[in-house]
UniProtKB/Swiss-Prot annotation:
It comes from the Bacteria. Signal peptide: none annotated. This is 4-hydroxy-3-methylbut-2-en-1-yl diphosphate synthase (flavodoxin). Its cofactor is [4Fe-4S] cluster. It comes from Klebsiella pneumoniae (strain 342). Converts 2C-methyl-D-erythritol 2,4-cyclodiphosphate (ME-2,4cPP) into 1-hydroxy-2-methyl-2-(E)-butenyl 4-diphosphate. Belongs to the IspG family. GO terms for biological process: isopentenyl diphosphate biosynthetic process, methylerythritol 4-phosphate pathway; terpenoid biosynthetic process.
Amino acid sequence: MHNQAPIQRRKSKRIYVGNVPIGDGAPIAVQSMTNTRTTDVAATVSQIKALERVGADIVRVSVPTMDAAEAFKLIKQQVNVPLVADIHFDYRIALKVAEYGVDCLRINPGNIGNEERIRTVVDCARDKNIPIRIGVNAGSLEKDLQEKYGEPTPQALLESAMRHVDHLDRLNFDQFKVSVKASDVFLAVESYRLLAKQIDQPLHLGITEAGGARSGAVKSAIGLGLLLSEGIGDTLRVSLAADPVEEIKVGFDILKSLRIRARGINFIACPTCSRQEFDVIGTVNALEQRLEDIITPMDVSIIGCVVNGPGEALVSTLGVTGGNKKSGLYEDGVRKDRLDNDDMIDQLEARIRAKASMLDEARRIDVQQLEAK
């Protein structure tokens, strides 16, 4: 029931990664990267399908060898989500996966080779209508820039990016997006700010090597949140030393928190105190797990007492306010029923699923009516 975020998106060109639009006001795409051995086709396909189930728009796959390129061919045949091939050092691998239907090529200008090799990759991408991501990383800047700046700086990352943007411009190729990633939040944020002023290509956001599940999520939320709140960013990846599925979940949580893109349930829950009338923490944890399959955007407030419960319920799709033995259930801000505290989880799950089905049906009818006009 909350309004959309009052954020003015940066204007950018439109490209497509497979069937996913990027830039020019398109929904911000959430992506992750496999961490399996790409040559283990079964494991990689299984992980990609798990990422698809939690809403991944795009998945990146590392292709370090020609054997991995051959495996990529088999992987591509078994999944539906667009795949980005991550290429380092050997430009010939990019040419090979292009033959196998890759949806996007990610190259690192710091290690892909000389201009002639880049030209060869670009010509191939143009012929096959494959977009490119220029991926600049603070950890792999070109040697001359390392010597010039002494250490990674926003200006160094910008210069690296612009060097290769200019190269693609000279080759008359505009189907690309750019990233300037760093593990330091301030370095990454300032680099993206500078880059956003220089080009109108889509920007892929990320805090690289952010850390483990908890610390990495925090760093990514701060860094990406700052940029997104300024309207910067067209795709994102939350980089975690964790199950890639968590990257997608955190990515959507960041977008939901900024009211930029909604997917699934946005739970609003109190941290609890001695006033709670039912087990709020247990209820929220259980429902988050049980309702992962719900993709309908909904705000669900679960508050343990009457101090803040009614107020949160007023602006929630569904809201629970703790009471003695029974708790008040609100729907669209109106009190509808009372739920037994001892059976809260099962009752609330049923109500949420019913509401999601109702909202889905209403949206389906709206779409049909629009199409009929």
